[in-house]
Amino acid sequence: FIKPDAKIEDAYATYYMGIFFPCDDRVHQPRDFRVQGLHKNAAMILGLDEGTEAPDVYIKLTPKNRQRQIKEPYVCIAAQASGQAKYWNNGRGWINVVKYLKQKGYRVLCIDRDSVYGQGSRFNLIPYGAEDFTGQIPLQERIDLLQYADFFIGLSSGLSWVANGMGKPVIMISGFTLPLNEFYTPYRLINY
């Protein structure tokens, strides 16, 4: 990758990759990422096939520690995201989910990076009743936790993609983006 301040004399082509605001900016992103999906936008910008899954580039994420560390049945959740609009802004949503899962005999492990995250006047906390497995730990440790989870519940965020990449059933809570923006899952809660 080339740093923004670097001067390149003879580049064939350069691309801006990412999410740009306002969302109607069609110079850097020809399509709205909330409608088209980031993975399809990147493919379109690079002139690649925009199919949902490319079997020749499928990556299976595997645990490093193959020994089960938690003997009880458990579920991993991730309640944090990169923007407030992606959060599940239902005041009792996570509380009810955690309570229900515990009644069913599951331990509920929150594997987000931060136990508290936000900006300005909006902050989100780890869901009440969930066990705190948050922290500045390597992604591999989260993969190790996901390995023996019965399933994963999360937002339209990176950890949902990680769980999906491991072949875990993912319950996706979305609403900021359309369902086609993420990978396919039959378990989706729409928040709009």
Regions found by a protein language model. Give the residues of each.
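Catalytic machinery of carbohydrate-active enzymes
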Residues: 1-192
